[in-house]
Amino acid sequence: METEQPEETFPNTETNGEFGKRPAEDMEEEQAFKRSRNTDEMVELRILLQSKNAGAVIGKGGKNIKALRTDYNASVSVPDSSGPERILSISADIETIGEILKKIIPTLEEGLQLPSPTATSQLPLESDAVECLNYQHYKGSDFDCELRLLIHQSLAGGIIGVKGAKIKELRENTQTTIKLFQECCPHSTDRVVLIGGKPDRVVECIKIILDLISESPIKGRAQPYDPNFYDETYDYGGFTMMFDDRRGRPVGFPMRGRGGFDRMPPGRGGRPMPPSRRDYDDMSPRRGPPPPPPGRGGRGGSRARNLPLPPPPPPRGGDLMAYDRRGRPGDRYDGMVGFSADETWDSAIDTWSPSEWQMAYEPQGGSGYDYSYAGGRGSYGDLGGPIITTQVTIPKDLAGSIIGKGGQRIKQIRHESGASIKIDEPLEGSEDRIITITGTQDQIQNAQYLLQNSVKQYADVEGF
């Protein structure tokens, strides 16, 4: 639905020589990266936007979007949504799409830019946010920007190439940063390709990617992302939500961490809510092959994040971790980290080292939770060493001490550890929640240590 938005117009690129022309050496570089596109072929581009940026594209009374449709003879739409994200859809030939993007990019702004937390700093709050990056402040195209391209998951391999060769070539030839997120958008088969750099180069990169994927047929089921099913528990590279208490409305900003916290999107009048993540997992096309047998964990890939999460297999015939209702460990550890029956949760974990935390939370043999598969290659080469996955369980009453207000605490743990951390909702009738940690061995160990400290520091203080 196109609603009336504050007046905002596109820059006149015809009178702005800086934006319309590129140095000869740039053109030579592009020629070195040859493309064999049919310039008349119609393709569809879908860009993930912050909801607040829809007004810049639509314009007051739909003025801007109507001008784009008329001037470029293209199909341009920004469907409404109830969350912090919307999708800009453009259907035209590739060259025309590039020109439309050059019109749109200077009108956008990036969301709240939070200071990066450090190991010793407090968690940043919205009041600490610096000024939004508004691309309209710049003249010409000499500024850095980011766009999030949506592609079907089956097309990712064509962008990455053999051992990452294609994506490396793209980065070098277009002088952009490219990150292909591994996890699909919530309840969809779409993945996010985050492209950053100067506007002209970002647009050129997108044109090349469109050319690459236009030659490849989509394989498998196609379920385009619907932003109304926005869910921060998915680490897909979209935008997260922060509520502006002064206005009582959600404010979107880029996900700079590695995921989100457990929170389902608010319902929308008359619109059915998506099934729970666990239910949806059963029909996900990304389930991959069955997990390898114990002791033969895969290497080189990340476990299919949308796999149905099994109950933790008991190491050596016992429970992975036993708790009482106050969140204290019980007395069954089967040779792992031992505690006396009267030892409290706080006194126990006070003395844990990272290695002891890891021992207590990982099954003996080291691979019982390492359900890896080779299909997940997003973030190719971003991390050193094999990517593994570990699952731990905590009483659901303690989850708040890890998540924190607005999810800020878990975001900081992700940021500091570099690991992907997901906290599942408890199963029906269960008093526990499963935490899935994905990353290198060092990242997982750091994450476990930070989780330990968070529970120790906040469980009693906040009354969990």
Curated annotation (Swiss-Prot):
Residues with the modification Phosphotyrosine, per the entry, are: Y380
Print the organism lineage: Eukaryota, Metazoa, Chordata, Craniata, Vertebrata
Identify residues that carry N-acetylmethionine: M1
Q: How does it assemble?
A: Identified in the spliceosome C complex. Interacts with ANKRD28, RBM42 and ZIK1. Interacts with DDX1. Interacts with MDM2; this interaction leads to ubiquitination and proteasomal degradation. Interacts with p53/TP53. Interacts with BRDT. Interacts with IVNS1ABP. Interacts with PPIA/CYPA. Part of a transcription inhibitory ribonucleoprotein complex composed at least of the circular RNA circZNF827, ZNF827 and HNRNPL.
Residues with the modification N6-acetyllysine, per the entry, are K34, K198, K405
Q: Provide the residue span(s) of the region labelled Disordered.
A: 1-37, 250-329
Annotated function = One of the major pre-mRNA-binding proteins. Binds tenaciously to poly(C) sequences. Likely to play a role in the nuclear metabolism of hnRNAs, particularly for pre-mRNAs that contain cytidine-rich sequences. Can also bind poly(C) single-stranded DNA. Plays an important role in p53/TP53 response to DNA damage, acting at the level of both transcription activation and repression. When sumoylated, acts as a transcriptional coactivator of p53/TP53, playing a role in p21/CDKN1A and 14-3-3 sigma/SFN induction.
Localization, UniProt: Cytoplasm; Nucleus, Nucleoplasm; Cell projection, Podosome
Q: Which species does the entry assign this protein to?
A: Macaca fascicularis
Q: Which residues carry this modification: Phosphothreonine?
A: T39
- The protein's name in its UniProt record: Heterogeneous nuclear ribonucleoprotein K
